[in-house]
Amino acid sequence: MLIQRIDIFCDYVLHKPLERVLHILDNIEDYYSEFERVKKDKFGNKKLNKPQYEHLGKYWTRIINPPRGDLKGIHKSINKYLVEKIRMPGYAFGGIKGKDNIRNARYHKGQKYIFQTDLKDFFPRITNKMVYKMFVGLGFSHDVSAMLTKLTTYKGHLPQGAPTSTTIANLVFVPTGMALQVIAEREGLRFTTFVDDVTMSSQTDFKNVVPEIIKTITSDGYKISQGKTTYKSGITEITGVKMLNNSMTVTDKFKATYVNEKDLTSPRAKGLLNYKKRIKAVSRAKKK
């Protein structure tokens, strides 16, 4: 049973009196930082905006708005409550305990045909209205839903860098995700999401289904990244893991990153090596 009264929710979940929470909401601008961060891949390499701009040093950037002070603790409490009380969809692998990008890739191991797309500007496109509708749909009262929405959205959308954003994004995406799950079950496909990455795969060619998959995503207000939308057979990459015929390994980009490490005893180099070992271990492990 979800808590329905905002005063009780503040006391027992947020560990703050209602008056304090209302004060934070009245001064919400004071509780968010804002800075620009260069996008990096899973190995810590900066992402170039366009390959031809490499000599100019132009990189992809994103605006980060992490909560600070009491609001940061409130976000952590909200996230803990949601994770404990709400069952996450089985297809979701991002931001969920016991799941990660490697296990997401492993779910598609051995599949011959693979469709992938990236949800462009995923967090910024999730509006406060979508978040409020999600909370009400979960069974929270309108008062609690309104308060949670105001606490977890900033400037009208989900903020990048907030502890709650990935969990909330997973939950907001559920109607679209379940529609994609219906398509997957009908066509005998495997389907997963890893935050803003959507993957479907099969042993048989399903190219004729791809337009329906894309339409299902975009009709709910999401936008796909054309440059990251692919349909392939054979060797490919899924969420930073290279997929071979029936095994997984590190990507060519990872190999280049590791080779270029000057100090192989550094924490970064050790982290890269452990990542490689994890892919190997997960690839060999039997599916439960």
Question: Predicted regions: what is each one?
Answer:
Residues R190-F194, K228:
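Short beta-strand
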Residues I168:
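Conserved binding-pocket/active-site segment within a compact domain
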Residues D196-S202:
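Short beta-strand->loop micro-motif that forms the acidic, two-metal-ion catalytic signature
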Residues M1-H55, Y59-A162, L171-A184, T204-K288:
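Right-hand nucleic-acid polymerase module
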